[in-house]
């Protein structure tokens, strides 16, 4: 029975005026909710209080021994496996039974951030810190120049996931803070890796060709560009950089917002205590010890200092703003009036030929139809945004959201005193000329404490047909699910949250990233391991919509790679569309009841036809067997 008449027509996009580039957008401010189950949760590392709404937590698993106390980072998925990055390496889980994830392999190979992606039998891992070694050793590297250092992409063969084989690496001048994997629909022989490096440029003595000079002084500068690696699938050991696109050309320094009054007071108190306070481009934040320690170790190592004196520590303190500025994309000297010199994340959507670049002070829309030569289609800036961090398209590519990692992820930015437009998401429509138009902001609607690092972070679309549903991490703000079908009116429809890791001081924790994969939602918890959730019916989401979403099956999924969700024909899909018609009051109750009755009848007839067909086949088999 054909059920095409059940499909809802595409949503009409309203005609809007594009805001002036760089201006703070006009928007009716979102209000913070002051009565919510997430407020006042008990603190604790593995025993914190929890609040959950319209979700069911099906599992939580702790990291293996060598990874406890070390930051868990991003996730990738292949078949029944979850690959979890960690600053100490990669953890591989078998989630054939999502309620009981089983540890398959903990591969010790330290490097920050160890963001991961997969394709076929290949695993790619980012390395950026100066302590990462080519041999995966745990002793680190103290020398300022070393040919044992890994800063770039590691490549593993995972034909046997229980025994990954390190087969190659591609070194880059600024390391790989994150990376994105691109499978071109028209190329089955190669894949491409877009590398976003945020570290200072390494010396040419360590990697020939690296230059940290301004492009005006050196056209081959490693600044103001990304790297594209081509990976031949029949010989991944030949992977190499094939281009370094300068997608930031002609961008000027974006507008910035300064600190709030509460922050100014907080910074002065922190300075008096001897803590590290840095100001980058008008944005201020206090660096947690978990950030300071590796930076100081790298600084002293590059200076050849094994036992720092008080004078050495003071020199590091003075150098820190410049170190952070290079990491966060700040200009220097002749380039201080230029725009960003790097991207943080680039979300690739090959099936529509577009990418969303979250590039420090700008959000970019890129054409990736030629994977080795992406180019910029549009750019937006906003003084409410401090650090454009990640991007997500809706399924048809008509909308895009960007996240703002105000403060770098290491500070509490979801307090009652923090503006709701800062550290939030910004939503845009994309017109036929591939220009982006601002619509609204959304931020976690409940206040978090001073002891909880909280700001907008990574997430993914959930394939509910006919709607744009997004699950997102907010560090210690937990995970939140929102409906952004109408980008001017984003609504929270589910959440999970824990209390702070500590109620005495700010300690890093919370959800680094969260993604939907084949019917379940997986969250990489920075300090606590891996959480697994499933959707439950609510006033915002029906059982039929959830069932239809779960008919979508992926062979693999990567954090910065966005697939087109496609729904196979099913009665769940038909019923989901009818539920949406009812919710949107597109038909009266009698009409809705009539359609549902016809679907029920069609399913019964279809089921009976299948049963009758099987019975006839069994009868034929019996008859042939008796002969």
Which functions belong to the PLM regions below?
Residues 1-7:
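Bacterial N-terminal signal peptides that target proteins for export
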